[in-house]
Amino acid sequence: MTHKVATDFEDGVTRFIDANTGETVADAAYRQGINLPLDCRDGACGACKCFAESGRYSLGEEYIEDALSEAEAEQGYVLTCQMRAESDCVIRVPAASDVCKTQQAGYQAAISNVRQLSESTIALSIKSASLNQLAFLPGQYVNLQVPGSDQTRAYSFSSLQKDGEVSFLIRKLPGGLMSSFLTSLAKVGDSVSLAGPLGAFYLREIKRPLLLLAGGTGLAPFTAMLEKIAEQGGEHPLHLIYGVTHDHDLVEMDKLEAFAARIPNFSYSACVASPDSAYPQKGYVTQYIEPKQLNGGEVDIYLCGPPPMVEAVSQYIRAQGIQPANFYYEKFAASA
């Protein structure tokens, strides 16, 4: 039996390792050409110390206190030369990917679907046999090369990978390089290059209630996360607040409704900032955060949106006098 171990490097690159039962993560990594920091291999030096974000694993008792203290082990630190995965895991590696003789993976795919969801948003799906090998954590992104140019644009996955196909939500920008291609030139079958996955914004192990805050096409990583949660189930409540500027920016509402039907503890709301909106809930995301959703601080908050939204939410939470258990955020600025 094998388990997937995601290695999240400090430069944002993520690579996946297949670890066999009883095999140390370090041995599995080196077997697959990923040279994690390592020295003694005996649990004596601490050179391979990483942080386990999630997953079940064993460390054995053969390492020494100087290499990994009891307090560090309780916090989630591991020695990869001793760590044996007992489920899929995620570890943070305190080194850049190039130092570990690896880099972001590259793929070729073809457009399988492209459609304009509204005057401001485009849905893009790409597919290829090689994408069956693409593994990523829900919430991460890739760099897509704009066909016919040497320019790339970063987009979060809006779906999980299924049968070699992945999807994205893309904001349409007047005169934008990718926007112009997708609206005027793109057709099914066109070739697309991508590299990744990248990013430290991804779904962690769910240990408490979640509050998900999306701004505009910042909804994309959350639909991928919700797809994963729908697959694996969970007992903790989660609420999504989706904020946009104009009515036409509201997209994928049918998908959110479908998730609400599939995930027992999931609820969502949406709001539109424009005072001219016909949508029932007007205003900003912070106006629709309820005290019960903050759960006295026993909550993990995920936020993806433009920088002003991230700052506004941060200020709001501070004003409530609450320190959430975890606050993960991804700022994005649309690129032309």
Swiss-Prot record:
Q: Which GO terms describe its biological process?
A: catabolic process
In the Enzyme Commission scheme, what number(s) does this protein have?
1.18.1.3
Binding annotation for [2Fe-2S] cluster: C40, C45, C48, C81
EC class name: oxidoreductase
- Which residue intervals make up region (Ferredoxin-reductase)? 99-336
The entry's free-text remark on the cofactor is: Binds 1 [2Fe-2S] cluster per subunit.
Residue ranges of domain 2Fe-2S ferredoxin-type in the record: 3-97
* Cofactor requirement: FAD; [2Fe-2S] cluster
The FAD-binding FR-type domain, residue ranges: 104-204
- Listed Pfam families: FAD_binding_6 (PF00970), Fer2 (PF00111), NAD_binding_1 (PF00175)
Q: Name one GO molecular function term.
A: ferredoxin-NAD+ reductase activity
Superkingdom: Bacteria
CDD domains the UniProt entry points to: BenDO_FAD_NAD, fer2
- Name the catalysed reactions: 2 reduced [2Fe-2S]-[ferredoxin] + NAD(+) + H(+) = 2 oxidized [2Fe-2S]-[ferredoxin] + NADH
Keywords associated with the record: 2Fe-2S, Aromatic hydrocarbons catabolism, FAD, Flavoprotein, Iron, Iron-sulfur, Metal-binding, NAD, Oxidoreductase, Plasmid
PANTHER family in alphabetical order: NADH OXIDOREDUCTASE HCR, PROTEIN RFBI
Family classification:
Belongs to the bacterial ring-hydroxylating dioxygenase ferredoxin reductase family.
Quote the function comment for this protein.
Electron transfer component of toluate 1,2-dioxygenase system.
What do we know about how this protein assembles, alone or with others?
Answer: This dioxygenase system consists of three proteins: the two subunits of the hydroxylase component (XylX and XylY), and an electron transfer component (XylZ).
Return the protein name. Answer: Toluate 1,2-dioxygenase electron transfer component
